[in-house]
UniProtKB/Swiss-Prot annotation:
The gene is aroQ. It catalyses: 3-dehydroquinate = 3-dehydroshikimate + H2O. The active site is at Y22 (proton acceptor), H99 (proton donor). It is an enzyme of class 4 (lyase). The record marks R17 as: Transition state stabilizer. This is 3-dehydroquinate dehydratase. SUPFAM superfamilies: Type II 3-dehydroquinate dehydratase. It comes from Herpetosiphon aurantiacus (strain ATCC 23779 / DSM 785 / 114-95). Its EC number is 4.2.1.10. It holds the Pfam family DHquinase_II. GO terms for biological process: amino acid biosynthetic process; aromatic amino acid family biosynthetic process; chorismate biosynthetic process; quinate catabolic process. It comes from the Bacteria. The lineage of its organism: Bacteria, Bacillati, Chloroflexota, Chloroflexia, Herpetosiphonales.
Length: 144
């Protein structure tokens, strides 16, 4: 099983950016924890982080027909990234949307996700471990 892990704008600054909201774990540390768990389950992960929506869409197009699922934290693109949402929709694979903070307990503009309606599920507010929970879902799906 091959999964694509997409990280949106500003996630490259995890560990430094507002640690009281997003925690002190770096993106590299999150990816390393995911890679370790995935490897033991026989799952291959490809990671991409970009601050540019078009790069994320191009990445989806490059992986079309080559992956079995997507784990995505769209960052601020969650709320208005329509080209990203459309790119995700054309992939025809399960998508799990992850957010480090509980977006529904924050500012009202963060409560709407353009991705949620096309995602299999959403994990919000469980910190960096939310990525591992998303990966667990794919591991269980692979085993079924």
């Amino acid at each position: 099983m091959q999964l694509l892990v997409l990280q949106g704008p500003n996630l490259n600054m995890l560990g430094q950016r507002e640690p009281t909201i997003y925690g002190s774990t770096s993106l590299a540390d999150i990816h390393n924890a995911m890679r370790e768990k995935a490897t033991s389950a026989g799952i291959e992960l490809s990671f991409i982080q970009s601050n540019h929506e078009g790069v994320l869409v191009d990445t989806l197009h490059a992986h079309y027909g080559k992956i079995q699922g997507i784990i995505i934290n769209p960052g601020a693109l969650t709320h208005y990234g329509l080209s990203l949402r459309d790119g995700l929709a054309l992939m025809d694979v399960p998508i799990i949307e992850v957010h480090l903070s509980n977006v529904y307990a924050r500012e009202a503009f963060r409560h709407h996700s353009v991705v949620a309606a096309i995602a299999q599920g959403q994990i919000s507010g469980l910190g960096w471990q939310g990525y591992l929970y998303a990966l667990d879902w794919f591991i269980q799906r692979k085993s079924a």
